[in-house]
């Protein structure tokens, strides 16, 4: 396999390039009988769509999904579901000045060294544009998990660059472009991003994703651990450089008497484990944190080399996200849902649950 498919029983194969005719995915293994229409998927795609605020790329893509197969009379048939999203606003000329050079921090150098050829238009296969099919597939996973188990997957931004965002309310999350759970912080975030765009620079972010309502018992020991698969999937999201569950790296400073979640007849007293022990879900909420690096396509000139290995100065023009973390929340939600539905089906196959 070439690393374009995620999942064991619920499999998603992603295809396309940023400036190609279309992008999409094939979802194989979706159980039959799930009510599904394009509107179910479109609602999630609209949350990720570019051009929705001044703080993200101004590329205007409608991201209208087309269901090509696997659905008949409004329900899934159990056969592969083909999903297509056409690219309509690519401006390939914006990349002519970097066609033979490499952006510091970008995958274009690694792609060229691996394949010996690269598509410089919008980053080609390495573009965050390719997260749209992931969100589309995740919408199906979310709907099945909710209908079968009442599982809810949602997320928010907890930090933008140097600005920490204290959690206030889930109700605040959909009301701003940042998916910030605290409306009072939004003006500060907007001012920071406005200055960042004027500087021609970029910044990173931290995203939190939470899955609630799943039962205990999902996951496998050793190599197919639930938390390992979550980390594997999340690292497939563009610009993610770190993944942790529960207390994560804070566990280093904790003592065992603090970190171990005490168990009472009413349930767990805390959730430092992030909902997973020994690679298997505990029934607690699964909590995942992502560290997202700054965008590498910036207007600030930086040193690099061209394909001949000669030193050059690189400046990236065109339309780019100054912080890819702003649109990352629905993508991270989709990835978590895809891992969970896969393990739910594996649990049902092995243990009948």
Swiss-Prot record:
Catalysed conversion reaction: 5-O-(1-carboxyvinyl)-3-phosphoshikimate = chorismate + phosphate
Coiled coil is among the record's keywords: no
Gene Ontology biological process terms, A to Z: amino acid biosynthetic process; aromatic amino acid family biosynthetic process; chorismate biosynthetic process
GO molecular function: chorismate synthase activity; FMN binding
Pfam families membership: Chorismate_synt (PF01264)
Pathway: Metabolic intermediate biosynthesis; chorismate biosynthesis; chorismate from D-erythrose 4-phosphate and phosphoenolpyruvate: step 7/7
Record: residues binding NADP(+): 48, 54
PROSITE patterns: CHORISMATE_SYNTHASE_1, CHORISMATE_SYNTHASE_2, CHORISMATE_SYNTHASE_3
Domain of life: Bacteria
Keywords: Amino-acid biosynthesis, Aromatic amino acid biosynthesis, FAD, Flavoprotein, FMN, Lyase, NADP
Cofactor requirement: FMNH2
Residues annotated for FMN binding in this entry: 125-127, 238-239, 278, 293-297, 319
InterPro entries noted in UniProt: Chorismate_synth (IPR000453), Chorismate_synth_AroC_sf (IPR035904), Chorismate_synthase_CS (IPR020541)
The EC number(s) this enzyme carries: 4.2.3.5
Comment on bound cofactor: Reduced FMN (FMNH(2)).
GO cellular component, one term: cytosol
Role this protein plays: This reaction introduces a second double bond into the aromatic ring system.
Binding partners and assembly: Homotetramer.
Name by which UniProt lists this protein: Chorismate synthase
Annotated source species: Bordetella pertussis (strain Tohama I / ATCC BAA-589 / NCTC 13251)
